[in-house]
Structures are given as structure tokens and as C-alpha cells.
């Protein structure tokens, strides 16, 4: 099965960008509570 590299990158970005965004918000919230 041939993998479309552009589709793979687009999917990776679509998953990683919101995940990293939520992770940054979580870290900021935790650091503010302490």
C-alpha cells in the first residue's frame, strides 16, 4: 500500500497542532495554580 506523504503530513499536523495547543494551555493553568 502506497502512502501519500502529503496526506500523512496533513493528518499529523491536524492532530498535533490542537493537541500541542491544549497541552500548552494545560501547562499554563497548572503553573498558575501553584
From Swiss-Prot:
Keyword annotations: Chloroplast, Membrane, Photosynthesis, Photosystem II, Plastid, Reaction center, Thylakoid, Transmembrane, Transmembrane helix
InterPro entries: PSII_PsbM, PSII_PsbM_sf
GO cellular component terms, A-Z: chloroplast thylakoid membrane; photosystem II
Superkingdom to which the source organism belongs: Eukaryota
This protein's record includes keyword Plastid: yes
Membrane-crossing segments per the record: 5-25
Matching Pfam families: PsbM
Main location (coarse class): plastid
Known partners and oligomeric status: PSII is composed of 1 copy each of membrane proteins PsbA, PsbB, PsbC, PsbD, PsbE, PsbF, PsbH, PsbI, PsbJ, PsbK, PsbL, PsbM, PsbT, PsbX, PsbY, PsbZ, Psb30/Ycf12, at least 3 peripheral proteins of the oxygen-evolving complex and a large number of cofactors. It forms dimeric complexes. Detected in both etioplasts and green leaves; PSII is only assembled in green leaves.
Protein family membership: Belongs to the PsbM family.
Role, per record: One of the components of the core complex of photosystem II (PSII). PSII is a light-driven water:plastoquinone oxidoreductase that uses light energy to abstract electrons from H(2)O, generating O(2) and a proton gradient subsequently used for ATP formation. It consists of a core antenna complex that captures photons, and an electron transfer chain that converts photonic excitation into a charge separation. This subunit is found at the monomer-monomer interface.
UniProt protein name: Photosystem II reaction center protein M
Native organism: Hordeum vulgare (Barley)
Lineage: Eukaryota, Viridiplantae, Streptophyta, Embryophyta, Tracheophyta
